[in-house]
Amino acid sequence: MDTRDVRRFNRYYTRILGVFDQKVFDLNYSMIEMRILGEIGRHPGITANELTNCLNIKKSYLSRKLSKLEGGGYISKKKKPDDSRSMHLFLSEKGLELNKYVEEQSDQKVLELLAPLDEANYQELVTAMKTIEKILYRVVPNELESGQ
């Protein structure tokens, strides 16, 4: 198996995504912090363990990021009734507002990036992305999306 094409595509796609990375939309938060906020927003009550699996990051790293977001008033933690060591994570009002802003800005950036494409090229791109996701899901399933 020759990995050069896969690695080339990864470098190219990562460079495209880099447009969104530098201090996300002039906020004092990183892309991973905004991803954490987004996952909590999409999955209210998610646990830290579920987040580490979903984002493929270490628990200690996630813990630091959650502390920053909690300290900023963007998230809240609630103990699970059956396990006091495990916490459910939720967005606060402030977190909901920031998440909405970032989602809107992200949508706008994608629209700007893809504006040169006509409808046929756009549909071809989306179909190709879905194909890539379907194939890669066989090796790295997304636990949250699969309902696990």
What are these regions (language model features)?
Residues 1-31:
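N-terminal leader segment of winged-helix/HTH proteins
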Residues 10, 17, 55, 99, ...:
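Short amphipathic alpha-helical/adjacent loop interface patches that line ligand
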Residues 17, 44, 99, 133-136:
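A structural signal for well-ordered alpha-helices, especially hydrophobic packing surfaces
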Residues 21-61, 66, 72:
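N-terminal helix-turn-helix DNA-binding core of bacterial DNA-binding proteins
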Residues 38, 100, 126:
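A cross-family signal for key residues in well-ordered alpha-helices
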Residues 67-123:
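Charged, amphipathic alpha-helical coiled-coil/dimerization segments
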Residues 104-148:
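Terminal interaction helix/tail motif
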